[in-house]
Amino acid sequence: GRVVDAAPDAHPLALSLPQRLAGKEVLAIPDPEGDEHGPGTYTYPKDNAFAPFQGLFDLLEMRILDSGATWTFVFPFKEMTNPWGAPAGFSHQLLNVYLDFKDGGRTDPFAKGAKVAFDPEHPWDLFLKAAGWPQYGQRVGFPDGTDTADGITVGSNPADKQVIVQLDKKHFNPASGQRVCFYVLVGSQDGYGPDHFRPVAKEAGPWNLGGAENEDAPLVVDYLWPEKGVQEAMLSRYGGGRHAVLKPYCVAWP
């Protein structure tokens, strides 16, 4: 048979087992429930693989735990299913996390896919990509265009509907009080889509989302921001060859 995927040698079993959360919570940023509609218009694909047709892309918050040598990022969703048998335990969620914590960086995405741009005041310094298939969904990216699977582990706790990302502190270890800004994008994972984002068209089909006004529409279904309406306002400013420009959510590191 054809080898569809292989787990990393170092942790061959860690992916399929629910990950226990260990560490002290240092940060929690909530996201409104029921806003998995991108700019406010997006609808689910029609194939039964997307049942229950709600909640699969609905990010509820981002928590960060201090786990010693690593940070543990926890992303709970309203729903989590695995109809396609993804090794990491979740089929649908695609997370792109961009961190701005120092000078310099980039204002375009790591790879062409999401159809967004980033605030010129907050260029990103580190990119985390999480999806259910480790060969492309367990990556750390850098502004120079290089990326690695070293120092990142992506798993899940399906019982609690959580995507769990462990990041080695060698990649990111801010000082207390340091300003850290987060761009947290949720897409619909598509193994054949641009940078594994599922396309959005005017009308939903079996395998594409609906609700786009034109081909410049962002492929972002949910975006981390605590206040209602901010995500929709940001993501709806596209068209005429221009992509939506995202602003990051910034905190003083505890």
Regions found by a protein language model. Give the residues of each.
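Short, ordered beta-strand-loop transition motifs
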Residues: 63-70, 153-161
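Surface-exposed, glycine/proline- and aromatic-rich loop segments on solvent-exposed faces
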Residues: 12-26, 44-131, 193, 250
